C-alpha cells in the first residue's frame, strides 16, 4: 500500500484534460498549462501530464503527486 497522496487525479496524469489547472496541496502553487513554469523552463501550452518526470513544485519542491485538480 502506498502512503503517497495521489492528488485528485489519483496519480494517473492520463486522466487529466490538457488544459487542467492543478494546485499543490502543500503550498497552493498553481500549475496552469496556459502559462507553463518559468522556474523549470516549461513552455506555455505544456499540459501537466507532459511535464518531465523530474518536475517538482517550483515553490515548495513537493512531488507532482501532491497536486490536485482545481475545479474553478
From Swiss-Prot:
GO biological process, one term: alkane catabolic process
Cofactor field: Fe(3+)
Annotated cofactor note: Binds 1 Fe(3+) ion per subunit.
Xref: InterPro entries: Rubredoxin-like_dom, Rubredoxin_dom, Rubredoxin_ET, Rubredoxin_Fe_BS
SUPFAM superfamilies tied to this protein: Rubredoxin-like
CDD domains, alphabetized: rubredoxin (cd00730)
Domain Rubredoxin-like: 19-70
GO molecular function, one term: electron transfer activity
Pfam families assigned: Rubredoxin (PF00301)
UniProt feature coiled coil, ranges: none
The keyword Ribonucleoprotein is annotated on this UniProt entry: no
Residues reported in the UniProt entry to bind Fe cation: 24, 27, 57, 60
Keywords noted in UniProt: Electron transport, Iron, Metal-binding, Transport
Role, per record: Could be an electron transport intermediate in hydrogen oxidation.
Similarity remark: Belongs to the rubredoxin family.
Protein name: Rubredoxin in uptake hydrogenase operon
Organism: Azotobacter chroococcum mcd 1
Lineage: Bacteria, Pseudomonadati, Pseudomonadota, Gammaproteobacteria, Pseudomonadales
Gene name per UniProt: hupR
